[in-house]
Amino acid sequence: MLVTVLMLGFVSVVIALGMKAYAQVQKFSFWVGNAGLAVVCLFLLFGSNQAFRAGLEANATKLFGAAPGVYDATIAAGQAAGAITPLFGGTLGVIFLAMPYIVFFNLWPNWGATLYGEVKGADDFRKNLSGMAYALILTTLLAVVFFILVNKTITWDFMNNANAAYWNYRWGYTTEAPPLVAWPYPAMLAMFTTSSPILQFVVLLAMSFWFFGWAGTVFLSSTRVIFAAAFDRVLPEAVATVEPRSRAPIWAMVLMVVPGLIVSYLYIYNKPVFGTGFASITLASTLVIAVTYLGSTIAAILLPWVKKDMYEASPIAKYKVLGLPAISVAGVIFGAFLVFLLYQWLIDPNALYGIGLKNTASVTFMGVMYLLAVVIYLVAMAVRRGQGVDLGKVYKEIPAE
């Protein structure tokens, strides 16, 4: 809990300094993390499985008190947990079932779309498009290269089984602790190929800078939403107050930090909510990013017909596919993919993902959050109506910049 409080303090200070200061922190953290990843990849590229096994045995015993033979014992524990996913091969059907896992991970690089409005040149849709596309393509390529390097030195078999053994115990499916009691962090495992504790520490510290650069983004996007809601009169005007020098929305930050402390406490100590440990309740949280995109996709499909004047005045209007608006064609394709993903995640007919309707508490929690948002809006609408303000007109159409 102390670490959480310190991180919240760090994030609050950095964001309170303003966008320019946070951008510098993020840029520095990004490149330090990249340097750490590059070193990890070099050790995986030039290392060997024999060196990794020897390093694992030595470090797991010294650092985590593991018994001798941790490599073989970890594979056995993972197999007992049911880890059978290969790195290569598989039928087309199996590949499609793997997509929801991959997209669940890849939703996060695209999550930056919520902040693209604050990027210089955001009014040029081509910059937004290229920014999102490059982020996804680069992330995917790095993941592929990294998996290949992991398979070369650590082996995919060990990595997969180590995770299965760890999470099988972590989520309470077995009472027997895994041979490797620490989470099998790939960077940590890669650095086991060196016997230098100083080098291990420096590289892992460098990799951790990604977290410091990313952590502020969670509050940055959320505080901007809270600020916008106050600016549009859904929340009290005081919430839109900004600090004169940094122009940071101070009260919006407070509305994030205080609930953040409460949620962190519930998560760290896994307090029961809806009869289930809070950690399990959060499993469906990433899913709502896809739900948000689905709503935007439907709006994009209908835009050329529902808001024809607005559409024809936009740069995207000149792009057609077989005479049809490109935005609608792309929207139908992407929308169908999102519906497939949401079906697999929520219905989960093959019991693969653990975040759907079978995880009743998690889905209920997400539903309560949506319901809370509706209640806040309806209450605000009633209050503002009494003040002579029609919120319906405020949200009917976004004004042109």
Language model: regions and residue ranges:
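C-terminal membrane-solvent junction of multi-pass transporters and transport-like membrane proteins
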Residues: 11, 25-28, 32, 242-247, ...
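Hydrophobic, small-residue-rich membrane helices and short re-entrant helix-turn-helix hairpins
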Residues: 17-27, 107-146, 223-245
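Alpha-helical transmembrane segments and their membrane-interface junctions
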Residues: 256-271, 335-355
